[in-house]
């Protein structure tokens, strides 16, 4: 009969179902942008407010060159808009570590592509992000226009020493 062709597809959809159980999604409106990698989303269902740390990326700190530009750029992309936040964990500060989707675009990746954030390569090995940072660096986009930009991680460490 014909039903043999259906089986692999069915198994595949089961696999995707089980995978998606490990991740959750918040759908809501962006009501705040704190900096280039932290936002606040109001959940559509119960209007609960979630602080979201954009996963896989590290934007310049506010005191750094490009810190404000990164914040403004992120705002221009998503502030006041409906987004979907996919996440698997919450950090020790109670922030949701998520990937933001808006109008079909993966916003975390867009930030890296345009030179408004570094790829957080220490924690994340996603090939698209590695490639995006290489390309932005090569094209001297955003923060890469500076010949020696300081990684936000290093910057935070140097601030703590003082």
Where are these regions (language model features)?
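Small beta-barrel nucleic-acid-binding modules, primarily SNase/OB-fold domains
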Residues: 2, 7-162
């Amino acid at each position: 009969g014909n039903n043999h062709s259906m089986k692999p597809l069915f198994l595949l959809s089961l696999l995707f179902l089980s995978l998606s159980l490990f991740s959750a999604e918040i759908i809501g409106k962006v009501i705040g942008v704190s900096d280039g990698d932290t936002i606040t989303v109001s959940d559509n269902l119960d209007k609960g407010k979630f602080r979201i740390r954009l996963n896989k990326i590290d934007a310049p700190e506010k005191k750094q060159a490009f810190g404000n530009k990164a914040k403004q750029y992120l705002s221009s992309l998503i502030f006041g808009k409906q987004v979907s936040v996919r996440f698997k964990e919450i950090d020790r500060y109670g922030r949701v570590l998520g990937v933001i989707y808006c109008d079909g675009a993966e916003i975390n990746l867009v930030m890296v592509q345009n030179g408004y954030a570094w790829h957080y390569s220490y924690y994340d090995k996603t090939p698209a992000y590695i490639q995006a940072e290489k390309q932005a660096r090569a094209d001297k986009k955003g923060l890469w226009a500076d010949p020696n930009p300081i990684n936000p991680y290093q910057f935070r460490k140097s601030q703590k020493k003082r």
